Every structure is written in structure tokens, then in C-alpha cells.
Amino acid sequence: MALLQISEPGLSAAPHQRRLAAGIDLGTTNSLVATVRSGQAETLADHEGRHLLPSVVHYQQQGHSVGYDARTNAALDTANTISSVKRLMGRSLADIQQRYPHLPYQFQASENGLPMIETAAGLLNPVRVSADILKALAARATEALAGELDGVVITVPAYFDDAQRQGTKDAARLAGLHVLRLLNEPTAAAIAYGLDSGQEGVIAVYDLGGGTFDISILRLSRGVFEVLATGGDSALGGDDFDHLLADYIREQADIPDRSDNRVQRELLDATIAAKIALSDADSVTVNVAGWQGEISREQFNELIAPLVKRTLLACRRALKDAGVEADEVLEVVMVGGSTRVPLVRERVGEFFGRPPLTSIDPDKVVAIGAAIQADILVGNKPDSEMLLLDVIPLSLGLETMGGLVEKVIPRNTTIPVARAQDFTTFKDGQTAMSIHVMQGERELVQDCRSLARFALRGIPALPAGGAHIRVTFQVDADGLLSVTAMEKSTGVEASIQVKPSYGLTDSEIASMIKDSMSYAEQDVKARMLAEQKVEAARVLESLHGALAADAALLSAAERQVIDNAAAHLSEVAQGDDVDAIEQAIKNVDKQTQDFAARRMDQSVRRALKGHSVDEV
């Protein structure tokens, strides 16, 4: 098979020139950056030998600081010290205020409802704050490697949605970084242990960080990681261990709850030091606020046992969601500094029936996996391993209504890979769907290459939008594409296999990519027009069905107004004025609101007919 370089046609790197890449673990509490040097992945330290960078930024009028310096200002200047910004990524202001009502920041909403944080440096959004953390990590890597980075792999939680992932990409772009790939954190941890090239089967990744707990159940098949289930607790982490132990020491030392900040800081520092020491020792001596006493590992275990049990309950739920039993799990990977606690390792081992993998520093394992992946994607592997560099040369997708192409797997995605997307029916009672597989970078079907067609039949006859079809694209290591369409409620499915790159030369691929750039603006306008025409057709189809069923609910005058609005929409939909079509759709919606309300009332009355209030 032809081996395809990641670089753009005509811009290939010199054959023996090593490119600089890094893996970044952008964490809630701490972040790290790692790279591969002399064949070994390692995290990079600052000038004081510290590998972790606190995910904290302190803003002032004159500038900002990131990391340890910023963290010291958390208690002194709370409003201008932003921490745990990862929790805010990709969320609306309303969502943030509902989820995290006790945040000490002053927020404003942007025009599109996104959060803006009031600081001494002005209004800042979570993307900007994340970008400042990424810049600090990139600067550390640039200095250590003595050169600018050619690309980075950034890790994200497996449960991150599209908005959160896009926010992370935007932050990287703002930081001046080229993102080779966003990699799921549990997948990165598995890669660090080499599980991506080992035995196929189910892998559990137990991630207990400072502020959150995540459990991910993965299935490895032919080098492809599939996330079967995720779970956890966003309000449970190692910080809770610290607070329980601090409360116990406070009680033993008779320290008032509301003593001054200096004593509270001293108490917390002593608590954290004791927790760390108890990972190796059976007991530790604690000195705080003039009090000295012994804390045993057994006492600490009793305090945290209920919290550890909560994590195992989340593991049980995730296994149930994944449809697998604990004894089916081949390996358990430990991630997060709090997994150093002996009780955690012991209970996790008992739960899964096997000792967890702990040989790699749990704080560093995700960053190390990201660095390994970045080294592959940037093109540093020798020829004997070049297969890992094979990529999809052109985007793969599907034809949707209006002759549009919906991309499912973007070009330059490394293979093997699997991606899925959900689609729905366009017409009432639709029982079949034609699946048209496309290849190319343009927005319209007429400008892309047709790869294959097949039909999915046996879809239940439901109203438009009622049936949900999941279409899965899977490309194996040989570049063979399998497309499967499955109706979710019935399980009925159909599939086809095709070789996407068959028959295309490198020059043809380059030409298709060049065309996509040359016609980008024109294509976007064409797509917007096609989308509005599809929406107009959907609105008219729905309206005609409603009128056929319930026209008696309208007076002659009301019917005339609706008919006029529909006729106008039908007329402008034949043209190419996007704004006119959009306004005509809004007008139909406005003129039919009362009609829709009457239809709803009539449906409710029919449903309740013959039933008493008590029955309802």
C-alpha cells in the first residue's frame, strides 16, 4: 500500500530531520508536558525540577503568572486567580452557574451566552485562560528541546463533548500550537503502558485526580480503542482525602474551625505531607499549631474508606453500562496522584481481581502516552514502523439532504480509526434510507468523489426525525473502509466495504485538497443555501401534513394567511437568496404558531378522552 506522509503535498519534511513534538496533559488541577527523546518518553521539568504545573492563572493589569506563582495568590486575590478552568470549557454561563454556584468569580455573558470572567486584565473567557496555561507548557518544551514545536497532542477526558473539544482546540490555536490530535485521557494512559500493541480485549482506566474521579472502560480491537462506557464523580478526588484528614487533625489538635488563614494553610500543608508519607510508612508524626501527634495508616484508611467505596460503585455502574463483568477486564491502568494511596490500589485490585498497573508515575502517565502518540503523528518513527503513519488522505463522509456532504472522518486522521455519527429520517413513515459514502474536501456532493452506495431497510415507520440511525465508519490498518448503518431501536443494520484510496494518485489527492481551499468561500455559501433549501422543504412537508389532518381547526381567513406564507416560501426556495429563504421560513413559523397550539390541545383532549382526573 502507498504510505502517506502527514505533511501537506509539497511540504514534506526532510527524510532524516527529526521533528519536535510534545504531549500535553491539560488537567483540572495540574498540567504536564512530555516529549520523546532518545526513544524514551519523559515529562519535562521547570528550572526547579518540578514536573507538575498547577493549572492556575493569576491576572493583573500589567500581565499574568501561571502555575506555582499564581497558586500562591489564590487566597490573597481570589477574584483574579483562575483555577480549574477545565470545568468551564465549552459550557454556557447558565450551565456553569447551575453546576458550580459557589465559584468566587464575577461572570458576564457574551453575546452568544458564553461565560466571560471579570479580571484585572479585563473580561476573559475559559479558552483564553486555557491558552495561557498551554503557552507556559509550550515554552517549557521549546526551551528543553531548543526549538519550536512542530505539533502537539493534547489529552481530554473521554466524556468531553464536541463543544469542550473544540474549546480545547481553540485554546491551542490561541497559544500558537499546531494540534496533531486530541487524545482521550484513558487512551493516552493505555498507550503509555504499550497496551495499544498488546492483547486485544477490555481495559479499565481508573483516574483519581485532585478534584475529580473518572472511570473509563475501553475495548482494544485491531489497534483501535473504543470507549465502551465512562463514569465517575466530578465532586470526588484526592482533595477530599485531604479535607477529611485535615478535619481529623483539627479535632485532635483542638484547632478552631475559623482560625486565621496562616494556621489553616499550615494545617493543610501538614495534612498533605502526612498523606504522602503514609503511602510508604505505617505511621507519621504531625506537627501543627503547637500540637504534635501520631497518625497511622490504619486511621487514614478508616477516614477515606467511604470515598474509595464511592469510586468502586462508579466502576460497577460503568461496567454495567459497558455490558462487561469485572473478571473480563484484562488490565487496570491507574491514573492520577491519588492512586498512590495504598488503600486505593488495594481496593481496586480486589474489585477487578487483578493488581493494577502502577509502574509509571500516575501523575505523568497521561502526558507520556500523549508524547508517544505525538512522536508518531509528527513523523519521527523509523521506516520499519511507518505503517503507524498511514493516514486518510481525503475526508470520508455521507451525502445528506440537499446534496450536502457531512464529513465523518477528516483527512489526515491516522489509521486505524473508527468514528460514528447519528442521522435521522426526513419524511414521515420513512422505512428505508440510502447511504451514499463520499470522499473529498468540498461541501457539495457534486464536487466530491462517490465511493459506494447501499440501503438500510426495515426502519420503523415513525414521524420525521423519529427514527435514529447510527452510521459507523471504520478504517483498518490496510486502509479498508467499512461503513455500517444501524437503526437504534430495532438493531436492523446494513454495511459495505470499500478501499477509499483506490484509483487515486498523489497528484489527484493534492488537486482535490487544493480545490477545497480555492473554492472554500464559494463552497460555504453553497452549503448555507442548500441547508436553507432543505429546511424550507422540511417545513413545507410538515405543514402540508398538518393541514391535511387538521385544516378544520382554521378559519378561512387563517387558512389563506398560512397558504400565502407557504406559497411565498415555496417560491423563494427556488432562488438563491439565503436571507430571503430564512425570513420566509420564520414567517411560516410565525403564521402557524396558533395552529400548532390548537393541534397540540386537540391531541391532549383526544388522549384524555374517557379518563378521569384520578386516572391521569
Swiss-Prot record:
GO biological process: iron-sulfur cluster assembly
Pfam entry (one): HSP70
Key words of the record: ATP-binding, Chaperone, Nucleotide-binding
Keyword ATP-binding (UniProt): yes
GO MF annotation: an example: ATP-dependent protein folding chaperone
Matches recorded under InterPro entries: ATPase_NBD, Heat_shock_70_CS, HscA_NBD, HSP70_C_sf, HSP70_peptide-bd_sf, Hsp_70_fam, ISC_FeS_clus_asmbl_HscA
PANTHER family: HEAT SHOCK PROTEIN 70KDA
NCBIfam families reported for this sequence: HscA, PRK05183.1
Protein family according to the UniProt entry: Belongs to the heat shock protein 70 family.
Function: Chaperone involved in the maturation of iron-sulfur cluster-containing proteins. Has a low intrinsic ATPase activity which is markedly stimulated by HscB. Involved in the maturation of IscU.
Protein name: Chaperone protein HscA homolog
